[in-house]
Amino acid sequence: MRKSVIAGNWKMHMTCAEAKSYLEEFIPLIKNIKDDRKVVIAPPFTAISTFSDHSDFEYLDISSQNIHWEDQGAFTAEISPKMLLEHGVSYAIVGHSEPRKYFSESDEQINKRAVFAQSSGLTPIVCVGETLEQRERGEADRVITRQVEQGLENTDPSNLIVAYEPIWAIGTGKTCEAEDANKICSLIRKLIGFDDVIIQYGGSVKPNNIDEIMSMSDIDGVLVGGASLDPNSFARIANYQ
């Protein structure tokens, strides 16, 4: 049985002091969480040490928001696996729509990040998703197929999370219908060819829609943006019914 992964991506939010206050409020809210799921938070790099130093760290895992495909070198603004592992990081988000959009990150680069994350002992959370224009033209399946085939080449599906994030639903308040999201997640699973691969949905996930999302057969978790910044909101999501 696949274990659900409920992940929060803080993006460029939270100082170390704010992260500490958040954890003090959040951790008691998930102490009795069911054992069929994991909770993961991806704080900014500066706040990762706040997580690893927290006394109740066992209640959740840490993810980075990016990772490079080299252990060291002249790669300004990047971060390497060994730097992250030193702080207890277990996961790394790669291929999020924001670096794809703002920094023109390619499927080839995303693949290099994912492969190196796995070889370094981290689990990559690889994001895929179509734009509104691509969806309206009926190209969603083709776009997702390309991103999966190119972005996941030579990865190990037993140590992998794929997050389906329709770009038009990220931070917009628009949510992909649960059945539609489930169809795409089913497609991703078939493309990968491994039934136990964990597939998340991301895109305006909130406390009022989490139960329906998690009732879908091919959705194994969520990647949450804005709603993960509020400890009560994210705790409700983590404790979905």
From Swiss-Prot:
Enzyme type, top EC level: isomerase
GO cellular component: cytosol
GO biological process: gluconeogenesis; glyceraldehyde-3-phosphate biosynthetic process; glycerol catabolic process; glycolytic process
Reaction catalysed by this enzyme: D-glyceraldehyde 3-phosphate = dihydroxyacetone phosphate
Pathway annotation: Carbohydrate biosynthesis; gluconeogenesis; Carbohydrate degradation; glycolysis; D-glyceraldehyde 3-phosphate from glycerone phosphate: step 1/1
HAMAP family (alphabetical): TIM_B
Name by which UniProt lists this protein: Triosephosphate isomerase
UniProt-annotated catalytic positions: 96 (electrophile), 165 (proton acceptor)
Keywords tagged on the record: Cytoplasm, Gluconeogenesis, Glycolysis, Isomerase
Its biological purpose: Involved in the gluconeogenesis. Catalyzes stereospecifically the conversion of dihydroxyacetone phosphate (DHAP) to D-glyceraldehyde-3-phosphate (G3P).
Entry annotated with the keyword Isomerase: yes
Cellular location(s): Cytoplasm
Gene it is expressed from: tpiA
Family: Belongs to the triosephosphate isomerase family.
Subunit structure: Homodimer.
GO MF annotations in UniProt: triose-phosphate isomerase activity
Gene3D superfamilies per record: Aldolase class I (3.20.20.70)
Keyword Ribosomal protein tagged: no
NCBIfam families per the UniProt record, alphabetical: tim
Chain segments annotated as coiled-coil in the UniProt record: none
Chain residues that bind substrate: 9-11, 171, 204, 225-226
E.C. numbers: 5.3.1.1
Superkingdom of source: Bacteria
InterPro entries: Aldolase_TIM, TIM_sf, TrioseP_Isoase_bac/euk, Triosephosphate_isomerase, Triosephosphate_isomerase_AS
